Design a protein with these regions (language model features):
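ATP-dependent adenylation/pyrophosphate-handling site
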Residues: 37-44, 48-82
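Hydrophobic anchor at the start of a short beta-strand
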Residues: 65, 104, 168
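Metal-dependent de-N-acetylase/amidase catalytic core
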Residues: 11-18, 26-40, 80, 98, ...
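N-terminal secretory signal peptides
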Residues: 1-4
């Protein structure tokens, strides 16, 4: 498929998703095939809290959604061993993915001990390559949590090495405390999927869902909605530069 055809295909497939900076294609008819959407998060609950409503919109529009969890959140439950916590949090992640109509994949790193090396760059590249994504979401790399940084940088390195570039977008979590220096380029109106996102986040019972929202996510959704001109929104930063993919003329 030539670059022009790819651009048109993705534009048509984006009908109804609602990115502020992408053209509206509400009049588009059929699409050649569903998009393949992948989200890479450091722990169970990161993709859900960062861009769960956007993932839900993609799934509702008929696109295939996969969530790759870098770890199983092994260090995330005080008083539980790594294996015990991993079992609990994996079950929570699977329940959240079921709500979002997403396929869960657990990459195999360990919460709190994540690494970036050639072996793991290759593993992430292979994971993403097997999914053949059109669009990938991951953490913004400037983050106070090392695991978030690792998930982001492994994804970025995979994108750099990809023979066929996918669109790469970064999401925010607990802005100002974890995600730092985040200046959105794109927004998604999540008014219709905000409640589904909340239900997915609340699947992570072990992580104190009210605390997740108290960390700033309620305010983030409201503030990003104010910026977009809607009741609620999720915000993203788009990868740009020489190596950017050829999907959109923005």
């Amino acid at each position: 498929m030539n670059p022009s055809s790819r651009r048109q295909f993705v534009k048509e497939a984006m009908t109804g998703i609602g990115f502020l900076t992408l053209p509206s294609f509400s009049g588009a008819s059929t699409i050649a095939r569903p998009l393949k959407i992948v989200c890479v998060g450091a722990h169970p609950d990161d993709p859900e809290s960062g861009c769960g409503a956007t993932l839900a919109k993609f799934a509702a529009a008929g696109h295939a959604v996969t969530i790759i969890y870098l770890t199983r959140g092994e260090a995330g439950i005080p008083g539980k061993s790594n294996d015990e916590a991993a079992a609990i949090r994996s079950k929570e992640a699977i329940a959240a993915c079921s709500l979002l109509k997403a396929k869960p994949i657990f990459a195999g790193q360990v919460d709190g001990d994540t690494v970036i090396n050639n072996e793991w760059v290759k593993k992430m590249q292979d994971l993403l390559g097997s999914e053949k994504p059109d669009i990938v979401f991951t953490h913004w790399p400037i983050d106070s949590h090392k695991d978030h940084q690792c998930a982001s940088l492994l994804t970025i390195q995979s994108w750099i090495r990809a023979s066929i570039k996918f669109e790469l977008y970064f999401f925010e979590v607990c802005a100002g405390e974890q995600t730092l220096g985040f200046k959105p380029t794109d927004y998604v109106d999540i008014t219709d999927t905000q409640e589904l996102k909340r239900k997915a986040v609340y699947c992570h019972v072990s992580q104190d869902p009210p605390g997740i929202y108290a960390c700033g996510h309620t305010a983030m959704e409201q503030f990003r909605g104010l910026e977009m001109g809607t009741a609620a929104a999720e915000a993203f930063m788009r990868m740009t530069g020489k190596k950017k993919g050829n999907y959109f003329d923005l």
